[in-house]
Protein backbone atom coordinates (compact mmCIF):
# COMPACT_ATOMS: atom_id res chain seq x y z
CA UNK A 1 0.00 0.00 0.00
CA UNK A 2 2.93 2.34 0.69
CA UNK A 3 4.15 1.90 -2.89
CA UNK A 4 0.68 2.62 -4.23
CA UNK A 5 0.44 5.90 -2.31
CA UNK A 6 3.99 6.84 -3.37
CA UNK A 7 3.11 6.28 -7.02
CA UNK A 8 -0.11 8.23 -6.59
CA UNK A 9 1.81 11.45 -6.01
CA UNK A 10 4.94 10.65 -8.01
CA UNK A 11 4.36 13.34 -10.63
CA UNK A 12 2.00 15.64 -8.76
CA UNK A 13 3.37 19.01 -9.78
CA UNK A 14 4.46 19.94 -13.27
CA UNK A 15 5.56 23.42 -12.12
CA UNK A 16 8.23 22.28 -9.70
CA UNK A 17 6.32 22.06 -6.41
CA UNK A 18 7.35 19.24 -4.12
CA UNK A 19 4.91 16.32 -4.03
CA UNK A 20 3.24 15.34 -0.77
CA UNK A 21 5.19 12.99 1.51
CA UNK A 22 4.48 9.25 1.29
CA UNK A 23 2.43 7.37 3.82
CA UNK A 24 4.64 6.24 6.72
CA UNK A 25 5.38 2.53 6.82
CA UNK A 26 5.55 0.34 9.88
CA UNK A 27 3.69 2.73 12.19
CA UNK A 28 0.76 2.02 14.47
CA UNK A 29 -2.71 1.42 13.09
CA UNK A 30 -3.95 4.92 13.88
CA UNK A 31 -1.10 6.58 12.01
CA UNK A 32 -2.58 9.05 9.49
CA UNK A 33 -2.17 8.36 5.79
CA UNK A 34 0.31 11.22 5.49
CA UNK A 35 2.54 12.58 8.26
CA UNK A 36 1.67 15.98 9.72
CA UNK A 37 2.50 18.60 7.12
CA UNK A 38 5.93 20.21 7.42
CA UNK A 39 6.94 17.76 10.16
CA UNK A 40 9.68 15.79 8.41
CA UNK A 41 8.39 15.55 4.85
CA UNK A 42 9.67 17.20 1.72
CA UNK A 43 7.12 19.99 2.02
CA UNK A 44 9.03 21.37 5.01
CA UNK A 45 11.99 22.32 2.83
CA UNK A 46 12.57 26.06 2.64
CA UNK A 47 12.49 27.86 -0.69
CA UNK A 48 14.95 30.73 -0.47
CA UNK A 49 14.84 33.54 -2.98
CA UNK A 50 18.09 34.66 -4.66
CA UNK A 51 19.66 38.05 -4.03
CA UNK A 52 17.60 41.12 -4.96
CA UNK A 53 17.48 41.92 -8.69
CA UNK A 54 19.47 44.69 -10.31
CA UNK A 55 17.79 47.52 -12.23
CA UNK A 56 16.88 46.05 -15.63
CA UNK A 57 14.08 46.66 -18.17
CA UNK A 58 10.62 45.57 -16.98
CA UNK A 59 10.48 42.59 -19.36
CA UNK A 60 13.79 41.25 -18.04
CA UNK A 61 12.67 41.92 -14.47
CA UNK A 62 9.49 39.94 -15.06
CA UNK A 63 11.46 36.98 -16.44
CA UNK A 64 13.81 37.18 -13.47
CA UNK A 65 10.84 36.85 -11.11
CA UNK A 66 9.59 33.78 -12.98
CA UNK A 67 13.05 32.21 -12.75
CA UNK A 68 13.41 32.97 -9.05
CA UNK A 69 10.03 31.41 -8.32
CA UNK A 70 10.53 28.45 -10.67
CA UNK A 71 7.20 29.43 -12.15
CA UNK A 72 7.69 29.35 -15.91
CA UNK A 73 4.04 28.37 -16.38
CA UNK A 74 2.86 31.53 -14.63
CA UNK A 75 1.98 33.61 -17.73
CA UNK A 76 0.15 30.67 -19.32
CA UNK A 77 -1.86 30.13 -16.14
CA UNK A 78 -2.76 33.82 -16.01
CA UNK A 79 -4.01 33.53 -19.58
CA UNK A 80 -5.92 30.36 -18.69
CA UNK A 81 -7.78 32.23 -15.95
CA UNK A 82 -9.22 34.45 -18.66
CA UNK A 83 -10.99 31.45 -20.23
CA UNK A 84 -13.07 30.53 -17.17
CA UNK A 85 -16.06 32.21 -15.56
CA UNK A 86 -15.68 30.62 -12.13
CA UNK A 87 -14.94 32.75 -9.08
CA UNK A 88 -11.86 30.98 -7.76
CA UNK A 89 -10.53 33.71 -5.49
CA UNK A 90 -13.25 35.69 -3.68
CA UNK A 91 -13.39 33.20 -0.82
CA UNK A 92 -9.68 33.79 -0.05
CA UNK A 93 -8.66 36.38 2.58
CA UNK A 94 -7.16 39.57 1.17
CA UNK A 95 -4.79 40.24 4.11
CA UNK A 96 -4.91 43.88 3.03
CA UNK A 97 -3.68 45.04 6.45
CA UNK A 98 -0.22 43.67 5.59
CA UNK A 99 0.16 46.42 2.96
CA UNK A 100 -1.02 49.49 4.87
CA UNK A 101 2.55 50.68 5.39
CA UNK A 102 3.85 49.74 1.94
CA UNK A 103 4.65 53.19 0.60
CA UNK A 104 5.92 51.75 -2.67
CA UNK A 105 2.29 50.93 -3.50
CA UNK A 106 1.09 54.51 -3.09
CA UNK A 107 -0.86 55.91 -6.03
CA UNK A 108 0.96 59.23 -5.57
CA UNK A 109 4.15 59.24 -7.69
CA UNK A 110 5.83 61.58 -5.21
CA UNK A 111 5.44 58.92 -2.49
CA UNK A 112 6.99 56.30 -4.75
CA UNK A 113 9.94 58.62 -5.49
CA UNK A 114 10.48 59.31 -1.79
CA UNK A 115 10.33 55.61 -0.97
CA UNK A 116 12.51 54.50 -3.88
CA UNK A 117 15.29 56.97 -3.10
CA UNK A 118 15.49 55.80 0.52
CA UNK A 119 14.77 52.07 0.26
CA UNK A 120 17.56 49.57 0.75
CA UNK A 121 16.72 46.16 -0.79
CA UNK A 122 16.37 43.30 1.67
CA UNK A 123 19.45 41.14 1.14
CA UNK A 124 18.78 38.64 3.90
CA UNK A 125 17.52 35.26 2.76
CA UNK A 126 13.77 35.31 2.13
CA UNK A 127 11.97 32.00 2.64
CA UNK A 128 8.74 32.07 0.66
CA UNK A 129 7.73 28.84 2.41
CA UNK A 130 7.59 30.43 5.84
CA UNK A 131 5.19 28.75 8.24
CA UNK A 132 2.56 29.96 10.65
CA UNK A 133 2.05 28.92 14.26
CA UNK A 134 -0.97 26.66 13.65
CA UNK A 135 -0.45 22.90 13.53
CA UNK A 136 -1.66 20.83 10.59
CA UNK A 137 -4.75 18.91 11.77
CA UNK A 138 -5.22 15.18 11.35
CA UNK A 139 -8.46 13.45 10.50
CA UNK A 140 -10.73 12.68 13.45
CA UNK A 141 -11.31 9.14 14.62
CA UNK A 142 -15.05 9.40 13.98
CA UNK A 143 -17.20 11.38 11.58
CA UNK A 144 -18.58 13.51 14.42
CA UNK A 145 -15.29 15.41 14.44
CA UNK A 146 -15.39 16.44 10.76
CA UNK A 147 -16.83 19.86 11.58
CA UNK A 148 -13.92 20.70 13.87
CA UNK A 149 -11.52 19.23 11.31
CA UNK A 150 -12.92 21.57 8.62
CA UNK A 151 -12.41 24.60 10.86
CA UNK A 152 -8.93 23.48 11.93
CA UNK A 153 -7.77 22.93 8.35
CA UNK A 154 -9.14 26.35 7.36
CA UNK A 155 -7.29 27.99 10.27
CA UNK A 156 -4.10 26.23 9.24
CA UNK A 157 -4.47 27.46 5.66
CA UNK A 158 -5.07 31.05 6.75
CA UNK A 159 -2.10 30.98 9.13
CA UNK A 160 0.23 29.56 6.48
CA UNK A 161 -1.06 32.04 3.90
CA UNK A 162 -0.44 35.02 6.16
CA UNK A 163 3.04 33.83 7.14
CA UNK A 164 4.03 33.29 3.53
CA UNK A 165 2.46 36.51 2.32
CA UNK A 166 4.77 38.51 4.54
CA UNK A 167 7.71 36.98 2.68
CA UNK A 168 6.07 37.57 -0.70
CA UNK A 169 5.51 41.20 0.28
CA UNK A 170 9.25 41.61 0.82
CA UNK A 171 9.96 40.01 -2.56
CA UNK A 172 7.54 42.43 -4.22
CA UNK A 173 9.25 45.38 -2.53
CA UNK A 174 12.66 44.28 -3.82
CA UNK A 175 11.39 43.96 -7.37
CA UNK A 176 9.55 47.29 -7.19
CA UNK A 177 12.79 48.87 -5.99
CA UNK A 178 14.64 47.47 -9.01
CA UNK A 179 11.84 48.71 -11.27
CA UNK A 180 11.96 52.20 -9.78
CA UNK A 181 15.75 52.46 -10.06
CA UNK A 182 15.58 51.43 -13.71
CA UNK A 183 12.92 54.04 -14.45
CA UNK A 184 14.89 56.67 -12.54
CA UNK A 185 18.06 55.89 -14.50
CA UNK A 186 16.14 56.04 -17.78
CA UNK A 187 14.62 59.42 -16.89
CA UNK A 188 18.01 60.82 -15.90
CA UNK A 189 19.46 59.77 -19.23
CA UNK A 190 16.58 61.38 -21.11
CA UNK A 191 17.00 64.52 -19.00
CA UNK A 192 20.69 64.76 -19.89
CA UNK A 193 19.93 64.25 -23.57
CA UNK A 194 17.26 66.97 -23.46
CA UNK A 195 19.67 69.34 -21.70
CA UNK A 196 22.35 68.74 -24.35
CA UNK A 197 19.79 69.65 -27.01
CA UNK A 198 18.94 72.88 -25.25
CA UNK A 199 15.57 71.75 -23.90
CA UNK A 200 15.60 72.15 -20.16
CA UNK A 201 12.95 70.09 -18.40
CA UNK A 202 12.29 69.53 -14.73
CA UNK A 203 13.79 66.18 -13.67
CA UNK A 204 11.30 65.60 -10.88
CA UNK A 205 8.35 66.23 -13.16
CA UNK A 206 9.74 63.84 -15.77
CA UNK A 207 10.26 61.15 -13.13
CA UNK A 208 6.75 61.48 -11.70
CA UNK A 209 5.25 61.34 -15.19
CA UNK A 210 7.22 58.19 -16.00
CA UNK A 211 6.13 56.52 -12.77
CA UNK A 212 2.51 57.34 -13.48
CA UNK A 213 2.86 55.95 -16.99
CA UNK A 214 4.82 52.75 -16.36
CA UNK A 215 5.44 51.98 -12.68
CA UNK A 216 1.89 51.03 -11.70
CA UNK A 217 1.29 48.93 -14.78
CA UNK A 218 4.50 46.94 -14.31
CA UNK A 219 3.94 46.58 -10.56
CA UNK A 220 0.51 45.09 -11.18
CA UNK A 221 2.06 42.69 -13.67
CA UNK A 222 4.65 41.54 -11.15
CA UNK A 223 2.06 41.23 -8.39
CA UNK A 224 -0.26 39.17 -10.58
CA UNK A 225 2.22 36.35 -11.18
CA UNK A 226 3.74 36.61 -7.70
CA UNK A 227 0.47 36.17 -5.84
CA UNK A 228 -0.80 33.52 -8.24
CA UNK A 229 2.28 31.53 -7.28
CA UNK A 230 1.50 32.11 -3.60
CA UNK A 231 -2.12 30.98 -3.75
CA UNK A 232 -1.66 28.11 -6.17
CA UNK A 233 1.39 26.47 -4.63
CA UNK A 234 0.23 26.81 -1.03
CA UNK A 235 -3.18 25.39 -1.90
CA UNK A 236 -1.59 22.49 -3.76
CA UNK A 237 0.67 21.55 -0.88
CA UNK A 238 -2.03 21.63 1.78
CA UNK A 239 -4.81 19.99 -0.22
CA UNK A 240 -2.67 17.16 -1.59
CA UNK A 241 -1.49 16.40 1.94
CA UNK A 242 -5.10 16.42 3.17
CA UNK A 243 -6.16 14.33 0.16
CA UNK A 244 -3.61 11.66 1.07
CA UNK A 245 -5.30 11.31 4.45
CA UNK A 246 -8.90 11.56 3.31
CA UNK A 247 -8.62 8.94 0.57
CA UNK A 248 -7.48 6.43 3.21
CA UNK A 249 -10.56 7.01 5.38
CA UNK A 250 -13.62 6.54 3.13
CA UNK A 251 -15.68 5.55 6.17
CA UNK A 252 -15.71 9.20 7.27
CA UNK A 253 -17.11 10.54 4.00
CA UNK A 254 -19.47 7.80 2.71
CA UNK A 255 -22.46 9.32 4.54
CA UNK A 256 -21.28 12.95 4.70
CA UNK A 257 -23.78 15.60 3.55
CA UNK A 258 -22.43 19.11 3.05
CA UNK A 259 -24.67 22.17 2.53
CA UNK A 260 -22.70 25.25 1.46
CA UNK A 261 -23.61 28.88 1.97
CA UNK A 262 -22.48 29.90 -1.51
CA UNK A 263 -21.19 28.33 -4.71
CA UNK A 264 -17.98 30.30 -4.17
CA UNK A 265 -17.14 27.95 -1.32
CA UNK A 266 -17.03 25.04 -3.74
CA UNK A 267 -15.53 26.93 -6.68
CA UNK A 268 -12.73 28.44 -4.58
CA UNK A 269 -9.20 27.08 -4.78
CA UNK A 270 -9.16 25.95 -1.17
CA UNK A 271 -11.68 23.15 -0.54
CA UNK A 272 -11.03 21.22 2.72
CA UNK A 273 -13.34 18.28 1.87
CA UNK A 274 -12.39 16.38 -1.30
CA UNK A 275 -14.92 13.59 -0.69
CA UNK A 276 -18.60 14.35 0.03
CA UNK A 277 -20.50 11.19 -0.89
CA UNK A 278 -23.75 11.74 1.03
CA UNK A 279 -25.09 14.95 -0.53
CA UNK A 280 -23.48 18.12 -1.87
CA UNK A 281 -25.80 21.13 -1.92
CA UNK A 282 -25.79 24.93 -1.94
CA UNK A 283 -28.51 26.25 0.38
CA UNK A 284 -30.37 22.99 0.02
CA UNK A 285 -30.19 22.84 -3.79
CA UNK A 286 -28.21 19.82 -5.09
CA UNK A 287 -25.14 20.55 -7.20
CA UNK A 288 -25.63 19.58 -10.84
CA UNK A 289 -23.36 16.83 -12.12
CA UNK A 290 -22.37 19.00 -15.08
CA UNK A 291 -21.34 21.88 -12.82
CA UNK A 292 -19.20 19.57 -10.71
CA UNK A 293 -17.52 18.16 -13.83
CA UNK A 294 -16.77 21.69 -15.07
CA UNK A 295 -15.34 22.67 -11.71
CA UNK A 296 -13.16 19.56 -11.63
CA UNK A 297 -11.93 20.39 -15.13
CA UNK A 298 -10.56 23.65 -13.76
CA UNK A 299 -9.08 21.97 -10.69
CA UNK A 300 -7.43 19.36 -12.89
CA UNK A 301 -5.75 22.05 -15.02
CA UNK A 302 -4.55 23.81 -11.87
CA UNK A 303 -3.23 20.49 -10.51
CA UNK A 304 -5.54 20.52 -7.50
CA UNK A 305 -7.35 17.47 -6.07
CA UNK A 306 -10.77 16.90 -7.60
CA UNK A 307 -13.93 17.25 -5.53
CA UNK A 308 -15.66 13.85 -5.52
CA UNK A 309 -19.30 13.18 -4.64
CA UNK A 310 -21.05 9.85 -5.18
CA UNK A 311 -24.42 11.58 -4.79
CA UNK A 312 -23.66 14.06 -7.59
CA UNK A 313 -21.55 12.14 -10.09
CA UNK A 314 -23.32 10.27 -12.87
CA UNK A 315 -22.30 6.59 -13.25
CA UNK A 316 -20.18 6.08 -16.34
CA UNK A 317 -19.76 9.82 -16.98
CA UNK A 318 -16.30 11.42 -17.12
CA UNK A 319 -15.07 13.24 -14.05
CA UNK A 320 -14.30 16.45 -15.94
CA UNK A 321 -15.93 18.48 -18.69
CA UNK A 322 -14.53 21.69 -20.24
CA UNK A 323 -16.69 24.63 -19.11
CA UNK A 324 -18.30 26.98 -21.61
CA UNK A 325 -16.94 30.51 -21.59
CA UNK A 326 -19.60 33.22 -21.47
CA UNK A 327 -18.21 36.51 -22.71
CA UNK A 328 -20.87 38.58 -20.95
CA UNK A 329 -20.03 37.17 -17.51
CA UNK A 330 -17.22 37.79 -15.09
CA UNK A 331 -14.04 35.78 -15.52
CA UNK A 332 -11.65 34.15 -13.08
CA UNK A 333 -8.88 36.55 -14.09
CA UNK A 334 -11.08 39.50 -13.15
CA UNK A 335 -11.93 38.08 -9.74
CA UNK A 336 -8.22 37.47 -9.22
CA UNK A 337 -7.37 41.09 -10.00
CA UNK A 338 -10.05 42.30 -7.57
CA UNK A 339 -8.18 40.35 -4.87
CA UNK A 340 -4.82 41.75 -6.00
CA UNK A 341 -6.09 45.33 -6.12
CA UNK A 342 -7.31 45.04 -2.53
CA UNK A 343 -3.65 44.62 -1.58
CA UNK A 344 -2.19 47.20 -3.95
CA UNK A 345 -4.74 49.87 -2.98
CA UNK A 346 -4.43 49.22 0.75
CA UNK A 347 -1.79 51.90 1.42
CA UNK A 348 -3.59 54.64 -0.48
CA UNK A 349 -6.95 53.72 1.03
CA UNK A 350 -5.52 53.73 4.55
CA UNK A 351 -3.70 57.07 4.19
CA UNK A 352 -6.42 58.91 2.25
CA UNK A 353 -7.53 62.27 3.64
CA UNK A 354 -11.26 62.87 4.36
CA UNK A 355 -11.66 65.03 1.26
CA UNK A 356 -10.07 62.37 -0.93
CA UNK A 357 -12.33 59.75 0.64
CA UNK A 358 -15.37 61.71 -0.49
CA UNK A 359 -14.02 61.77 -4.03
CA UNK A 360 -13.45 58.04 -3.91
CA UNK A 361 -17.02 57.39 -2.80
CA UNK A 362 -18.58 59.54 -5.55
CA UNK A 363 -17.78 58.40 -9.07
CA UNK A 364 -18.80 61.71 -10.67
CA UNK A 365 -16.09 63.60 -8.75
CA UNK A 366 -13.20 61.24 -9.43
CA UNK A 367 -10.23 62.67 -11.24
CA UNK A 368 -9.73 61.04 -14.61
CA UNK A 369 -5.96 61.30 -14.27
CA UNK A 370 -5.77 59.47 -10.94
CA UNK A 371 -3.23 56.68 -10.94
CA UNK A 372 -4.46 53.15 -10.28
CA UNK A 373 -3.59 49.50 -10.78
CA UNK A 374 -6.15 48.81 -13.49
CA UNK A 375 -9.80 47.86 -13.41
CA UNK A 376 -12.04 44.94 -14.30
CA UNK A 377 -15.75 44.50 -14.84
CA UNK A 378 -15.80 42.18 -11.82
CA UNK A 379 -15.04 45.19 -9.62
CA UNK A 380 -18.18 46.92 -10.91
CA UNK A 381 -20.57 44.00 -10.39
CA UNK A 382 -23.54 44.67 -8.15
CA UNK A 383 -23.59 41.44 -6.17
CA UNK A 384 -26.67 40.57 -4.11
CA UNK A 385 -26.30 41.21 -0.40
CA UNK A 386 -26.41 37.52 0.48
CA UNK A 387 -23.51 36.74 -1.87
CA UNK A 388 -21.28 39.78 -1.34
CA UNK A 389 -17.65 38.93 -0.53
CA UNK A 390 -16.71 39.58 3.08
CA UNK A 391 -13.29 39.80 4.66
CA UNK A 392 -14.46 37.54 7.48
CA UNK A 393 -15.28 34.81 4.98
CA UNK A 394 -18.38 32.71 4.47
CA UNK A 395 -20.04 30.62 7.13
CA UNK A 396 -18.79 27.08 7.57
CA UNK A 397 -20.81 24.46 5.67
CA UNK A 398 -23.63 22.71 7.47
CA UNK A 399 -22.71 19.05 7.91
CA UNK A 400 -25.04 16.11 8.37
CA UNK A 401 -24.95 12.37 7.71
CA UNK A 402 -27.14 9.86 5.91
CA UNK A 403 -29.05 7.36 8.05
CA UNK A 404 -27.48 4.00 8.73
CA UNK A 405 -27.68 1.65 5.77
CA UNK A 406 -27.52 4.44 3.16
CA UNK A 407 -23.77 4.42 2.65
CA UNK A 408 -22.60 5.70 -0.74
CA UNK A 409 -19.34 4.85 -2.45
CA UNK A 410 -17.73 6.37 -5.50
CA UNK A 411 -18.43 4.41 -8.68
CA UNK A 412 -15.28 5.73 -10.36
CA UNK A 413 -11.83 5.28 -8.91
CA UNK A 414 -9.94 8.46 -8.03
CA UNK A 415 -7.65 9.53 -10.88
CA UNK A 416 -4.09 8.46 -10.17
CA UNK A 417 -0.83 7.99 -11.99
CA UNK A 418 -0.79 4.28 -11.10
CA UNK A 419 -0.86 1.83 -14.03
CA UNK A 420 -2.35 -1.60 -13.42
CA UNK A 421 -2.30 -4.83 -15.42
CA UNK A 422 -0.32 -5.06 -18.65
CA UNK A 423 0.94 -1.47 -18.34
CA UNK A 424 2.62 -2.02 -14.98
CA UNK A 425 6.36 -1.30 -14.99
CA UNK A 426 8.73 -2.08 -12.17
CA UNK A 427 11.35 0.55 -11.35
CA UNK A 428 10.94 2.09 -14.79
CA UNK A 429 12.12 -1.06 -16.59
CA UNK A 430 10.30 -3.48 -18.88
CA UNK A 431 10.05 -6.87 -17.21
CA UNK A 432 9.44 -10.05 -19.21
CA UNK A 433 6.34 -11.82 -17.89
CA UNK A 434 6.79 -15.10 -19.80
CA UNK A 435 7.96 -16.96 -16.69
CA UNK A 436 5.13 -15.57 -14.61
CA UNK A 437 2.59 -16.74 -17.21
CA UNK A 438 3.63 -20.33 -16.47
CA UNK A 439 1.97 -20.00 -13.08
CA UNK A 440 -1.42 -20.04 -14.80
CA UNK A 441 -0.87 -23.72 -15.70
CA UNK A 442 0.56 -24.72 -12.33
CA UNK A 443 -1.31 -27.59 -10.65
CA UNK A 444 -2.01 -26.66 -7.04
CA UNK A 445 -2.92 -30.30 -6.27
CA UNK A 446 0.81 -31.03 -6.31
CA UNK A 447 1.05 -29.03 -3.08
CA UNK A 448 -1.80 -30.89 -1.44
CA UNK A 449 -4.02 -27.80 -1.51
CA UNK A 450 -6.66 -29.06 -3.91
CA UNK A 451 -10.37 -28.33 -3.93
CA UNK A 452 -11.13 -30.92 -1.27
CA UNK A 453 -10.69 -29.44 2.21
CA UNK A 454 -8.38 -31.13 4.59
CA UNK A 455 -9.44 -32.75 7.84
CA UNK A 456 -10.52 -30.36 10.54
CA UNK A 457 -11.32 -27.60 8.08
CA UNK A 458 -14.65 -25.83 8.64
CA UNK A 459 -15.98 -23.68 5.78
CA UNK A 460 -16.54 -20.02 6.69
CA UNK A 461 -14.70 -20.44 9.92
CA UNK A 462 -15.14 -17.22 11.91
CA UNK A 463 -11.99 -17.55 13.98
CA UNK A 464 -9.46 -16.85 11.19
CA UNK A 465 -11.69 -14.01 9.93
CA UNK A 466 -11.77 -12.32 13.29
CA UNK A 467 -8.05 -12.70 13.64
CA UNK A 468 -7.39 -10.59 10.57
CA UNK A 469 -5.80 -7.20 11.09
CA UNK A 470 -7.92 -4.13 10.25
CA UNK A 471 -5.11 -2.95 7.98
CA UNK A 472 -5.85 -5.97 5.77
CA UNK A 473 -9.43 -4.80 5.29
CA UNK A 474 -8.29 -1.22 4.58
CA UNK A 475 -5.89 -2.44 1.92
CA UNK A 476 -8.54 -4.73 0.40
CA UNK A 477 -11.04 -1.88 0.20
CA UNK A 478 -8.45 0.50 -1.28
CA UNK A 479 -7.44 -2.09 -3.86
CA UNK A 480 -11.04 -2.71 -4.97
CA UNK A 481 -11.67 1.05 -5.13
CA UNK A 482 -8.59 1.50 -7.32
CA UNK A 483 -9.96 -1.12 -9.72
CA UNK A 484 -13.38 0.54 -9.79
CA UNK A 485 -15.17 -2.43 -8.18
CA UNK A 486 -18.33 -1.48 -6.28
CA UNK A 487 -19.09 -4.90 -4.85
CA UNK A 488 -16.90 -7.88 -4.24
CA UNK A 489 -17.00 -10.05 -7.28
CA UNK A 490 -18.12 -7.09 -9.48
Curated annotation (Swiss-Prot):
This is Tegument protein VP16. Its main location: virion. Interacts with VP22. Interacts with gH (via C-terminus). Interacts with the virion host shutoff protein (vhs). Interacts with VP11/12. Associates with the VP16-induced complex; binding to host HCFC1 activates VP16 for association with the octamer motif-binding host protein POU2F1, to form a multiprotein-DNA complex responsible for activating transcription of the viral immediate early genes. The transcriptional activation region seems to target many proteins of the RNA polymerase II transcription machinery. The lineage of its organism: Viruses, Duplodnaviria, Heunggongvirae, Peploviricota, Herviviricetes. One of its GO terms (molecular function) is DNA binding. It comes from Human herpesvirus 1 (strain F). GO terms for biological process: DNA-templated viral transcription; regulation of DNA-templated transcription. Residues 12-37 are annotated as: Disordered. One of its GO terms (cellular component) is host cell nucleus. InterPro entries: Alpha_TIF, Alpha_TIF_sf, HSV_VP16_C. The modification Phosphoserine is found at residues 18, 353, 411, 452. It is found in: Virion tegument; Host nucleus. The record marks 442 as: Critical role in activation. Belongs to the herpesviridae tegument protein VP16 protein family. Transcriptional activator of immediate-early (IE) gene products (alpha genes). Acts as a key activator of lytic infection by initiating the lytic program through the assembly of the transcriptional regulatory VP16-induced complex composed of VP16 and two cellular factors, HCFC1 and POU2F 1. VP16-induced complex represents a regulatory switch: when it is on, it promotes IE-gene expression and thus lytic infection, and when it is off, it limits IE-gene transcription favoring latent infection. Pfam families: Alpha_TIF, HSV_VP16_C. Residues 411-490 are annotated as: Transcriptional activation. Keywords: DNA-binding, Host nucleus, Host-virus interaction, Phosphoprotein, Transcription, Transcription regulation, Virion, Virion tegument. SMART domains: Alpha_TIF.
Amino acid sequence: MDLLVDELFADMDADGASPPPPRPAGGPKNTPAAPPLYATGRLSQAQLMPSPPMPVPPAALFNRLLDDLGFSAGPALCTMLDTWNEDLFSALPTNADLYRECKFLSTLPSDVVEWGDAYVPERAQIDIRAHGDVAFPTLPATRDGLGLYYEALSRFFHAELRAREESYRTVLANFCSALYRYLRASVRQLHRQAHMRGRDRDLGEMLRATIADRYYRETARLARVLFLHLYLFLTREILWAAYAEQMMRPDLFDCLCCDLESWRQLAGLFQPFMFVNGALTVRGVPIEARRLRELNHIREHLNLPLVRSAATEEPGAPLTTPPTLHGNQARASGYFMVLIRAKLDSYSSFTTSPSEAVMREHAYSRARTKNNYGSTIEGLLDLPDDDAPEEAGLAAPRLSFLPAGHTRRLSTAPPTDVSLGDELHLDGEDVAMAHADALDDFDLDMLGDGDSPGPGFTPHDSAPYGALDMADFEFEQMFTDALGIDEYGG
